[in-house]
């Protein structure tokens, strides 16, 4: 069969994933049935890396061991020190993407190796490249980077052209004019 290609919205505060199946978009829940995964990474007292809800709980106890809002620093080389472990924003994003990949594989019952990832329209080419790198670190081939708020809705099937998301605010044609670095858009 065709490998599953999921759409991932790697958000600043929350991330989510979806897949195009049977002519419709299906949101992918995690093991607990949550569709949104907090974009938070933490290192607990034993040095274990936590992501999502577990990391958010850690943030309430010890915010110094947690990183959030790191998406905007992708591609800048800024480091985060979490309890003595150093991370680049790409590495933190990769941990969130890996968490999403695992949830998707559990939900779909098949391997997920590719994704379409949405980023803010203002992301420059460094940030877009950093997003692809984060996906690579998570074991995901990121075939396309698109401008949010589209990924979950525009989960691409094989060779399917990305069109306008019904109910979305903007069409991709409009965004193309505003954003010079649209070369990754199909």
Language-model features and meaning:
Residues 1-38, 43-185:
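N-terminal phosphate-binding loop and flanking beta/alpha elements of the actin-like ATPase fold
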């Amino acid at each position: 069969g065709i490998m599953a290609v999921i759409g991932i919205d790697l958000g600043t505060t929350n991330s989510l994933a979806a897949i195009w199946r049977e002519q419709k978009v299906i949101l992918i829940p995690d093991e607990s049935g949550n569709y949104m995964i907090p974009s938070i990474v933490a290192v607990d007292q034993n040095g274990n890396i936590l992501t999502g809800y577990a990391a958010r709980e850690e943030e309430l106890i010890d915010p110094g061991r947690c990183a959030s809002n790191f998406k905007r620093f992708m591609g800048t080389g800024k480091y985060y020190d979490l309890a003595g472990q150093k991370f680049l924003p790409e590495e933190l994003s990769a941990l969130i993407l890996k968490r999403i990949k695992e949830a998707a594989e559990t939900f779909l019952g098949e391997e997920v190796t590719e994704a379409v990832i949405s980023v803010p329209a203002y992301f420059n080419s460094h940030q877009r490249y950093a997003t692809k790198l984060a996906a690579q670190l998570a074991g995901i081939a990121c075939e396309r980077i698109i401008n949010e708020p589209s990924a979950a809705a525009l989960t691409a099937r094989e060779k399917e052209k990305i069109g306008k998301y019904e109910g979305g605010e903007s069409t991709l044609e409009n965004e193309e004019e505003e954003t010079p670095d649209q070369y990754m858009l199909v």
